[in-house]
Protein backbone atom coordinates (compact mmCIF):
# COMPACT_ATOMS: atom_id res chain seq x y z
CA UNK A 1 0.00 0.00 0.00
CA UNK A 2 1.25 3.46 -0.87
CA UNK A 3 1.34 5.68 2.19
CA UNK A 4 1.21 9.43 2.54
CA UNK A 5 4.95 9.67 2.99
CA UNK A 6 5.53 8.10 -0.43
CA UNK A 7 3.43 10.80 -2.08
CA UNK A 8 5.14 13.54 -0.09
CA UNK A 9 8.61 12.28 -1.00
CA UNK A 10 7.63 12.09 -4.67
CA UNK A 11 6.18 15.61 -4.49
CA UNK A 12 9.35 16.89 -2.83
CA UNK A 13 11.49 15.25 -5.53
CA UNK A 14 9.41 16.79 -8.31
CA UNK A 15 9.57 20.18 -6.63
CA UNK A 16 13.34 19.86 -6.24
CA UNK A 17 13.71 18.93 -9.92
CA UNK A 18 11.75 22.08 -10.79
CA UNK A 19 13.96 24.24 -8.59
CA UNK A 20 17.11 22.70 -10.07
CA UNK A 21 15.71 23.33 -13.56
CA UNK A 22 15.27 27.00 -12.74
CA UNK A 23 18.73 27.43 -11.24
CA UNK A 24 20.65 25.45 -13.86
CA UNK A 25 19.02 26.86 -16.96
CA UNK A 26 18.30 30.56 -16.69
CA UNK A 27 18.82 31.22 -20.40
CA UNK A 28 15.79 29.56 -21.97
CA UNK A 29 12.33 30.91 -21.12
CA UNK A 30 10.57 27.69 -22.15
CA UNK A 31 12.62 25.65 -19.69
CA UNK A 32 11.85 28.21 -16.98
CA UNK A 33 8.11 27.95 -17.64
CA UNK A 34 8.24 24.15 -17.65
CA UNK A 35 10.17 24.12 -14.36
CA UNK A 36 7.63 26.43 -12.73
CA UNK A 37 4.78 24.22 -13.94
CA UNK A 38 6.56 21.13 -12.57
CA UNK A 39 6.86 22.81 -9.19
CA UNK A 40 3.19 23.74 -9.26
CA UNK A 41 2.17 20.18 -10.13
CA UNK A 42 4.29 18.84 -7.27
CA UNK A 43 2.42 21.10 -4.87
CA UNK A 44 -0.88 19.94 -6.36
CA UNK A 45 0.10 16.32 -5.84
CA UNK A 46 0.78 17.06 -2.18
CA UNK A 47 -2.64 18.73 -1.88
CA UNK A 48 -4.32 15.64 -3.33
CA UNK A 49 -2.30 13.29 -1.12
CA UNK A 50 -3.22 15.18 2.05
CA UNK A 51 -6.82 15.44 0.91
CA UNK A 52 -7.01 11.69 0.36
CA UNK A 53 -5.24 10.94 3.63
CA UNK A 54 -7.56 13.20 5.64
CA UNK A 55 -10.70 12.06 3.75
CA UNK A 56 -11.52 15.65 2.81
CA UNK A 57 -12.41 16.78 -0.71
CA UNK A 58 -11.49 20.42 -0.14
CA UNK A 59 -7.88 19.83 -1.19
CA UNK A 60 -8.96 18.15 -4.41
CA UNK A 61 -11.35 20.99 -5.24
CA UNK A 62 -8.58 23.49 -4.52
CA UNK A 63 -6.35 21.62 -6.99
CA UNK A 64 -8.92 22.17 -9.75
CA UNK A 65 -8.76 25.91 -9.15
CA UNK A 66 -4.95 25.85 -9.12
CA UNK A 67 -4.88 23.88 -12.39
CA UNK A 68 -7.23 26.40 -13.99
CA UNK A 69 -5.00 29.29 -12.99
CA UNK A 70 -1.89 27.36 -14.10
CA UNK A 71 -3.42 26.69 -17.52
CA UNK A 72 -4.23 30.37 -17.96
CA UNK A 73 -0.72 31.30 -16.80
CA UNK A 74 0.87 28.89 -19.26
CA UNK A 75 -1.28 30.12 -22.14
CA UNK A 76 -0.49 33.77 -21.45
CA UNK A 77 3.20 33.01 -20.92
CA UNK A 78 3.46 31.12 -24.20
CA UNK A 79 1.56 33.85 -26.05
CA UNK A 80 3.99 36.47 -24.73
CA UNK A 81 6.87 34.19 -25.65
CA UNK A 82 5.63 33.79 -29.23
CA UNK A 83 5.21 37.57 -29.56
CA UNK A 84 8.73 38.16 -28.25
CA UNK A 85 10.18 35.54 -30.58
CA UNK A 86 8.49 37.15 -33.57
CA UNK A 87 10.00 40.53 -32.70
CA UNK A 88 13.44 39.57 -31.40
CA UNK A 89 14.06 36.16 -33.07
CA UNK A 90 15.33 34.76 -29.77
CA UNK A 91 13.98 33.41 -26.49
CA UNK A 92 17.14 33.89 -24.45
CA UNK A 93 16.51 35.63 -21.16
CA UNK A 94 19.70 37.69 -21.56
CA UNK A 95 18.43 39.17 -24.82
CA UNK A 96 15.09 40.19 -23.31
CA UNK A 97 16.59 43.09 -21.37
CA UNK A 98 16.15 45.17 -24.52
CA UNK A 99 12.54 45.58 -23.42
CA UNK A 100 13.54 47.86 -20.55
CA UNK A 101 12.15 51.38 -20.90
From Swiss-Prot:
GO MF term set: NADH:ubiquinone reductase (non-electrogenic) activity; quinone binding
UniProt entry keywords in alphabetical sequence: Cell inner membrane, Cell membrane, Membrane, NAD, Quinone, Translocase, Transmembrane, Transmembrane helix, Transport, Ubiquinone
Biological process, per Gene Ontology: ATP synthesis coupled electron transport
Subcellular location: Cell inner membrane
Main location class: membrane
UniProt topology in membrane: Multi-pass membrane protein
Pfam families registered for this protein in UniProt: Oxidored_q2 (PF00420)
Enzyme class at the top of the EC tree: translocase
An example Gene Ontology CC term for this record: NADH dehydrogenase complex
Catalytic activity from the UniProt record: a quinone + NADH + 5 H(+)(in) = a quinol + NAD(+) + 4 H(+)(out)
EC number, UniProt record: 7.1.1.-
InterPro entries associated with the record: NADH_UbQ_OxRdtase_chain4L/K (IPR001133), NUOK/Mnh_C1-like (IPR039428)
Record-annotated membrane-spanning stretches: 4-24, 30-50, 61-81
Organism domain of life: Bacteria
Sequence similarity: Belongs to the complex I subunit 4L family.
Function, in words: NDH-1 shuttles electrons from NADH, via FMN and iron-sulfur (Fe-S) centers, to quinones in the respiratory chain. The immediate electron acceptor for the enzyme in this species is believed to be ubiquinone. Couples the redox reaction to proton translocation (for every two electrons transferred, four hydrogen ions are translocated across the cytoplasmic membrane), and thus conserves the redox energy in a proton gradient.
Subunit-structure text: NDH-1 is composed of 14 different subunits. Subunits NuoA, H, J, K, L, M, N constitute the membrane sector of the complex.
Name the UniProt record assigns to this protein: NADH-quinone oxidoreductase subunit K
Organism: Nitrosomonas europaea (strain ATCC 19718 / CIP 103999 / KCTC 2705 / NBRC 14298)
